Amino acid sequence: MENKGVVYIDYLNSYVEVTKRKLPKWLSWCVYKLCNYFGFIKKNDNFFTLIAEENDVINEKMLNNLYEKLFEFDIKTVVCAELLLKNERFVKWIREKKIEILDGRWLFRFLPYDIFNKIAYIKNVKKSDLEVSILVNKPTELTNQNVVEFAKECKILNIITDDVLAFRVLEKKMLDEYGIIINVSTNKEKSCVRSDLIFNFDFNQKDLKKCKMNNKAVLVQLDKEKFIRNEGVTITFVKLKIPYKYGEIAKVYRHFNEEILYESFLYYKTSYKNVRKILKRDGVNIRYFIGNNGKIEFNEFRM
């Protein structure tokens, strides 16, 4: 089930897991400390376990051994246990080696249409009554597909960008094929003012601060960069309802975030439509939203 092109990096639950043999605890502890000191790593197919407990040191020898294994098998992408993702030194070291760490953002960018549907449901409003704005300077197939999805259903669709010319073909397609006009503008200050829902694909902090948003607007921060608003709801991630078959795997990969784990199973070079088909096939849907301060309660969207 797991993606063989990705390596999963975990840590030991307890020092007694250092060996499959049943040893006295004192001996297991000695073996563990020795293996930890020399930076040993247990490998089971594409699942690597660092010989380190939850709060133990991941030393230079272990990091070097890990890199050698990743280099040997030409691994460019890894999924890390949640605790390792919180280890700034470990994450920095991985990224310095030009290795990608899956963090859920790839999957998150395929979910704007689901977010749009969920928020309309929570607010108890028609999708055709919502004004949506998309903030993007470097359009991709993914952003363009989202534009098409929104334009067909929302009341007004605004695209705020520094590169208006990049959307000329899409503008013409929407008008010719669907009779839909989309508003493409460079005006960051005024274009978002009446928006109910704003999706930020790649605006940085400086550009975001130029965008005037009303307090009832929901900002969906698809970009990794954290953005703090004085008022209004900001969505930074989602909690998904994962299919049972994947949930059973998550019980085995118990140290891993479920959404990132699910992302890793889908992480291939494929089209927007293919990913959407898989999500529909698996019956994936949004349980709740996550903001800068954790879970966002549904009543916050109605304020």
Question: What does each model-found stretch correspond to?
Answer:
Residues 224-303:
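Adenosine-phosphate binding glycine-rich loop
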Residues 2, 8-21, 31-92, 295-303:
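Metallocofactor- and cofactor-centric catalytic cores in central/energy metabolism, strongly enriched
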Residues 180-246:
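Rossmann-like adenosine-cofactor binding region
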Residues 84-91, 143, 164-171, 206-208, ...:
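Short, charged/polar "capping" segments at the starts of alpha-helices
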Residues 122-189:
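Glycine-rich phosphate/diphosphate-binding loop of Rossmann-like nucleotide-binding domains
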Residues 8-13, 52-55, 80-83, 135-138, ...:
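Structural motif
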Residues 18-25, 88-97, 147-149, 168-177:
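Short, aromatic/basic amphipathic alpha-helical patches
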Residues 100-117:
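A glycine-rich, Thr/Ser-enriched phosphate-binding loop motif common to dinucleotide/cofactor-binding enzymes
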